Amino acid sequence: MTKFIFVTGGVVSSLGKGITAASLGRLLKSRGLKVAIQKFDPYINVDPGTMSPYQHGEVFVTDDGAETDLDLGHYERFIDINLTKNSNVTTGKVYWAVISKERRGDYLGGTVQVIPHITNEIKERILRVAKESNPDVVITEIGGTVGDIESLPFLEAIRQLKNDVGKDNVLYIHVTLVPTLRVTGELKTKPTQHSVKELRSIGIQPDIIVARSEQPLSREITEKIALFCDIDKNAVIQAVDASNIYEVPLKLKEEGLDDIVIKKLGLTCGEPDLSEWEQIVERYKNPKFEVTIGIVGKYVSLPDAYLSVAEALRHAGIYHETRVNIRWIDSEMLEKEPVEKYLSNLDGILVPGGFGDRGVEGKIKAIQYARENKVPYLGLCLGMQTAVIEFARNVAGLKDANSSEFKPDGPHSVIDLLPEQKEVEQLGGTMRLGLYPCKLVPGTKAHAAYGEEIIYERHRHRYEFNNEYRELLTGLGLVISGTSPDGRLVEIIELSDHPWFVATQFHPEFKSRPNRPHPLFREFIGASLKTNKLF
């Protein structure tokens, strides 16, 4: 029988529920259990695909093309599994499904209500994940904060599910904040007490409380939380701020979180093997070398917009025993000031994905600097498209070269809309999304990195390399090192006369893992080390 673990949050948002859920998943997997995981987001958007990165952060893309919450990236990286569209459910998706059923007549003329129709749909989404892979444990994170009106249907659904599947098969974990009063240095438990009171008023009694704090909890504080929240003392898990997120599973293991979960759910499993994870943390905390990578983007004031990119760089750093210092560079500043001011002392330059023309000229200047000064360069999605534009302008002499996204009537659209996108009017969920094969050319840097001829990578784009310019640009030194298997779509480009200049139409950052860095990020950091005199 599959067991169900629900992770809720209280007091404030952004407490780290996602990291807590991912860390627990890692601990349970290390014991030999099969783990599935999902997140419920209470917003009414169907998915985050059309949301501003400033509002939501990164959009994480799964193999099957779902545009999802960035926490799914944490889940995949920590647990080392590939998730699906069923792993991220929003209020918008739930209501869309229920209204579609009502329009089809599935409810036989009945009045459609939050209870039971919305809550039943939510429960069905939870059980669907259990049926999909038949795991030992399903971990479900409930987004938002207890007390938010948007979260109420989800909380009611997980309350009901305990009766549906049996109380011995469900466990509730509540992540909360124990703040410190700076004036006195005193830890305060009242916010936690009120948060649990709110949760209990809905009918949910937490089995475990994960208490986030800046400093360790004293025995008195732990006992006070246990008393007022009516849980066992050993079920109060302190989660003191860690120096990096990869330490969190080890910290929670020290607190005995997985032992309590195993005991309360009656799971049969072995002892955890965290040796590989311990090695990852050790290499992360004690690097031998150091590089500085500039990420040139338009959303750099919110680094979460490029979360998977930053983590993929760190994974490559772990592999090379190298501290990767990330310098966030606003591409608009490169349009106003000399690029040398921002780029002259970098070991590598990366231009990530994005949409719209704001800051694009700054990205093109950064790419020109990397090309002319032989600085290692990695371009992702828009970072490939702008690399093609830069090459067309400054090497091929097509001064008006551009993308039809930015200049629809330009004379040289070296980047153009995919043919199948030209009749698309609706923005949401209509891009080229998900996992696609790519055929690599032997003898190229891309082929050397992967060591394979056919690879599979995740995409999220509408625009592509315009094949009308393929012969001209390749004749001047642009190398097309990866294409779709039929050769029609250009997926990877390189420069033949550069130490390491590679750009991809896909998003390799989504497939990187701390124990298995993505080949392109691994080689990019390796090339950046060679430009660093400390190596």
Swiss-Prot record:
Swiss-Prot/TrEMBL GO biological process terms: 'de novo' CTP biosynthetic process; pyrimidine nucleobase biosynthetic process
Residue ranges annotated for the Glutamine amidotransferase type-1 domain, each copy included: 292-534
Regulation: Allosterically activated by GTP, when glutamine is the substrate; GTP has no effect on the reaction when ammonia is the substrate. The allosteric effector GTP functions by stabilizing the protein conformation that binds the tetrahedral intermediate(s) formed during glutamine hydrolysis. Inhibited by the product CTP, via allosteric rather than competitive inhibition.
Leading EC class: ligase
Region: Amidoligase domain, residue numbers: 1-267
Gene Ontology annotations for the cellular component aspect, listed alphabetically: cytosol
GO molecular-function term, one example from the UniProt record: CTP synthase activity
Residues reported in the UniProt entry to bind ATP: 14-19, 71
Keyword Transferase applies: no
Pfam families associated with the record: CTP_synth_N, GATase
Sites where the protein binds Mg(2+): 71, 141
Xref: Gene3D superfamilies: 3.40.50.880, P-loop containing nucleotide triphosphate hydrolases
Additional remark text: CTPSs have evolved a hybrid strategy for distinguishing between UTP and CTP. The overlapping regions of the product feedback inhibitory and substrate sites recognize a common feature in both compounds, the triphosphate moiety. To differentiate isosteric substrate and product pyrimidine rings, an additional pocket far from the expected kinase/ligase catalytic site, specifically recognizes the cytosine and ribose portions of the product inhibitor.
Record note on quaternary structure: Homotetramer.
Biological function: Catalyzes the ATP-dependent amination of UTP to CTP with either L-glutamine or ammonia as the source of nitrogen. Regulates intracellular CTP levels through interactions with the four ribonucleotide triphosphates.
Family membership: Belongs to the CTP synthase family.
Protein name in UniProt: CTP synthase
Organism name: Carboxydothermus hydrogenoformans (strain ATCC BAA-161 / DSM 6008 / Z-2901)
